[in-house]
Amino acid sequence: MPSPTTRHLVLTFGFAVAALPAVAADGKAVYDKTCVACHASGVANAPKLGDKAAWAPRVATGKDALFGAVVKGKGAMPPKAGAADLKDDDIMAAIDYMLTAAK
């Protein structure tokens, strides 16, 4: 039988874990669900995933500028890529995934 101290630690740890914010979605999962339709083929001038030359000028603007472009929309891309329920953490995860592929 666990000691009262052990039970207290387990309960405390359990509450601490439950209080953590939800982990942002995997960037690839967000890309596959929301971004792939345009960024896989380059539709409407969208830079293709992994195309270093196409991504270079966007990389130069920085992640904050890319985030703003996704949130507000840019060119043919609607705000939040048409996924109004997309969370900021998910957007950043997708940006990180696409930038990593462009290196």
Language-model region placement:
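Sec/Tat signal peptide C-region and signal peptidase I cleavage site
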Residues: 18-25
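Axial heme c-ligation environment in periplasmic c-type cytochrome domains
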Residues: 47-48, 56, 68-93, 98-102
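His/Cys-centered metal/cofactor-coordination and adjacent catalytic loops
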Residues: 4, 41-56
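The canonical Cys-X-X-Cys-His
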Residues: 35-41, 94
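Local sequence-structure signature of Cys/Sec-based thiol-disulfide redox active-site neighborhoods
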Residues: 25-34
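Cleavable N-terminal signal peptides
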Residues: 11-12, 22
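Bacterial N-terminal signal peptides that target proteins for export
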Residues: 1-11
